[in-house]
Amino acid sequence: MATAHLRTFIGALRFRETYTGNEPKIVITTPTGQLHELGALMVAALVSVDGWLPVYLGPNTPADEIVACAMQSGARTVSLSLTYPADDPRIPTELTRLRSQLDQKIPIFVGGSAAAHHYDLTNRLGLLSPPTLDELRHSLKMLRQSQIGASA
């Protein structure tokens, strides 16, 4: 019950911003098998304050759907939350499929309590895993600034 209330509260936070349509988009979700979405919701709320437009897919999203959403929305990046179970045998397949199908120019961020469990895999795939939310926000700020500079 407390989780449902917290989810509603965090979900409402991310819709308080007024969007202009010029914000860069970020797809936020949890991969197949990952049902705990509070971390993903927190990221959605935080990045909206930082000028990103979160495209929130909810939990348990297959790699193919993440790729399709990123391509259709024109997302500049993808953020995944990995929490429980840390040793989910589907994670390596889903992350590998996501990285292979998504444009290599689109960075993929991975965070959450189970991200460290998959460090070797995420490193090999070139996924980014900032250890804190502040570092994620900083990385997204740098990404946004580099893309603004590239389009000028």
Where are these predicted regions, by residue range?
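C-terminal regulatory/effector modules of DNA-binding transcriptional regulators
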Residues: M1-A2, T8-A152
